Amino acid sequence: MTMPLYASPEQILRDRSEYARKGISRGRSVVVLRYADGVLFVAENPSSTLHKVSEIYDRIGFAAVGRYSEFENLRQAGIRFADVRGYQNDPRDVTGRSLANVYAQTLGSIFTEQIKPLEVEICVAEVGHTPEHDTLYRLTYDGSIVEEPQHSVMGGQAETTATALKESYEEGLPLAAALRVAVKALSAGSASTGNGKPELLEAANLEAAVLERDRPRRAFRRLKGTALAALLQDTPPDDADADADAGKKPANDGNLPPNDDKS
């Protein structure tokens, strides 16, 4: 009679952690940081259709790395939670903290109860009416929450990117300066520009967005096209092009097809 295979709970959880970390390590990095007028999201993402940065609610944004189909499901679930809570109670009850708690419960339950953990790491950011009330929450695959005071880095080269970010980041930077700091940090950890190479990531390989403190109603705005290029070069964009880029509503990502590529 053969003995059944046995693995201790500790070993099972270690194996799940290693599996999730390996999946996340293959994804390109994302930087989320506070700047003078709100919160800035910058991701290395050459795709124009698969977004790693999105809007959740009026003043709440979402960024993620890992397996796209998994964090896209989390994003859509977060939107449903925020809409229902805001409708049944009050929009002021929808906060970054409440959303982060829901995500933590979901990630933790899947990690402990399912065979396969989610290969994702996410950040929930909320812009306050004053800088002191801006909040950043980073959540890992096992449901752990870390409240970041100034910035958060996720992805395969998070350590290298975070080190570069700490060297240049200052609190209260204007948008253009904060964007260049984030891009420089991402470039230091990128496989395409790192390893001592001086090149910076180009606008075509970046996804950027902001939560603007003084923007009425919906604080989320994507930075792209000539507006993004001008910010990277710190030059004023053509007025018509800048207005077009800034005035577009955030893209509706809800109907994107699932994709298992690591993002």
UniProtKB/Swiss-Prot annotation:
Output the Gene3D superfamilies linked to this UniProt entry. Answer: Glutamine Phosphoribosylpyrophosphate, subunit 1, domain 1
Please name the pathway: Protein degradation; proteasomal Pup-dependent pathway
Q: Which residues form the signal peptide?
A: none
One short Pfam name that applies is Proteasome
Under the heading SUPFAM superfamilies, the entry gives:
N-terminal nucleophile aminohydrolases (Ntn hydrolases) (SSF56235)
Name the domain of life. Bacteria
Note the InterPro entries from the entry: Ntn_hydrolases_N, Proteasome_alpha, Proteasome_alpha-type, Proteasome_asu_bac, Proteasome_sua/b
Q: Name one GO cellular component term.
A: cytoplasm
The segments labelled Disordered in the record are: 229-263
Q: Which GO terms describe its molecular function?
A: threonine-type endopeptidase activity
GO-annotated biological processes: modification-dependent protein catabolic process; proteasomal protein catabolic process
What does the entry report regarding how activity is regulated? The formation of the proteasomal ATPase ARC-20S proteasome complex, likely via the docking of the C-termini of ARC into the intersubunit pockets in the alpha-rings, may trigger opening of the gate for substrate entry. Interconversion between the open-gate and close-gate conformations leads to a dynamic regulation of the 20S proteasome proteolysis activity.
Compartment(s): Cytoplasm
Alphabetic keyword roster = Cytoplasm, Proteasome
UniProt subunit comment: The 20S proteasome core is composed of 14 alpha and 14 beta subunits that assemble into four stacked heptameric rings, resulting in a barrel-shaped structure. The two inner rings, each composed of seven catalytic beta subunits, are sandwiched by two outer rings, each composed of seven alpha subunits. The catalytic chamber with the active sites is on the inside of the barrel. Has a gated structure, the ends of the cylinder being occluded by the N-termini of the alpha-subunits. Is capped by the proteasome-associated ATPase, ARC.
- Which family, according to UniProt? Belongs to the peptidase T1A family.
Q: In UniProt terms, what function does this protein have?
A: Component of the proteasome core, a large protease complex with broad specificity involved in protein degradation.
Q: What is this protein called?
A: Proteasome subunit alpha
Query: What organism does the UniProt record list as the source?
Result: Actinosynnema mirum (strain ATCC 29888 / DSM 43827 / JCM 3225 / NBRC 14064 / NCIMB 13271 / NRRL B-12336 / IMRU 3971 / 101)
